[in-house]
Amino acid sequence: MSLAVPARPLRAMIGCLVVFAGLSAATAAAAPEIASDGPAHWTPPAQLTWYWQLQGKVSNSQPVAAYDIDGFETAAAQVSALHSLGKHVICYIDVGTAENFRPDYSSFPASVLGKGNGWPGEKWIDIRQLGVVEPIMTRRFELCREKGFDAVEPDNIEGFENTSGFPLTAAEQLTYDEWVAEEVHSLGMAVLQKNDPTQTPELEGYFDGALTEQCNQYKECEAFAPYVAAGKPVLNAEYHLATKKFCAADQSRGFMGARFALALKGKKFQPCW
């Protein structure tokens, strides 16, 4: 996600409803749980109240249990201040693209930089080149830990469904996404699945919850049912639908939905709870 010109990341939606429309709670509950070998970490509750802001000065006064804010832009002092108010803090970090405005952009060699993803200055990366990409991401996760964050929101974990410039397969994406979850856990933080609805059945056991964008608008919400069945939170952000158009549906599913302005500058926050 670029912090300059907000737009929804481009991704293929074909077949999502067909695959997941018949998903039952019983089937979802049967999904295997993957044990974490890392240190103990925060376990987000299913009914997690949350606030999301990635640009601008962040106020600490939102009446929620968790904040999701930018890992690079947020100082450790603000994370500490939020902790002193009894809040948990989630670290937004991009793991699927390289953003030319980030301080570590020069760490990405040209060989892993693909096509733009619709955001200025942002390109998909070749997640198959694990020997190159993983050390960069580990340093990003370590930055989150050093600042005191409790969890990570890894963005753009669905390059295989986009025109990335690389012939990424679903299996390669799963390998990378599972590594992301395990690496974050190894550093003592929780981790949320960000979008990627088609791979939820395989990913739920690795992640501690999910954050989805516009699942009501794009009719993808049922794909995240396995998280609810497992007692994990599903945080849904809608940008264009009025709350009266989606809050009842989110509540009936057990999702924690809210409406935000697309720029995520803190200008709009209309929660469903």
Feature-to-residue mapping (PLM):
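Glycan-processing catalytic domains of CAZymes
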Residues: 32-273
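Secretory targeting and sorting signals
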Residues: 2-31
